[in-house]
C-alpha cells in the first residue's frame, strides 16, 4: 500500500532482508495501525478472520473468501479508540500481513476506511442527498485526500544486534485535522 502514513521497515542488504523476511513469515513483527472507518461498532473490540485473495471480478482489488475456498489466511484484530457517530477511530493489529488486509477486512464487515475509493469508503458521499452533510464530507475528503490509515507502531528483533526494537509514529497533521472536524 502506498497511501498509508507512518512507519515501514526496509533493508540495506540481502542478509538483513532475509532476517526481516523470516520475522514477517513467522508473524513475530508487531504492527499496529490506526484507521478511521465509517459507521459505529456495537462491540469495543473484535477479530476478523477471512482468507484474502485477488477479486474474481476486479484483479486490481483484493477480496475476502469467507468460505476459505481461495486466498490466504488473514487475521485482523481491532479495537475501538473513539466513536465519533458516523465514523469510528480504531486500532488494528495484524496477525498476518496480506495485501490491503485492513482495508479489505474492514470493508467486509461493513466499515470501510474513510475516503478509501477502492473499497467503498467514498460511497457515503455518493448516496448523500442532504446538501449540508454532503459539503461537510467533501470538506473532510479535501483535508485528507487519501484513505485514513496510519502505521502507528512497528516492533521487531533487530537483524544485526538481535535487540527487540519498537518504533512509534504520531498521527500526521492531515489525520489530526480530519479528527478535529468530527
Feature roles, as predicted:
Residues 2-182:
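RNA pseudouridine synthases
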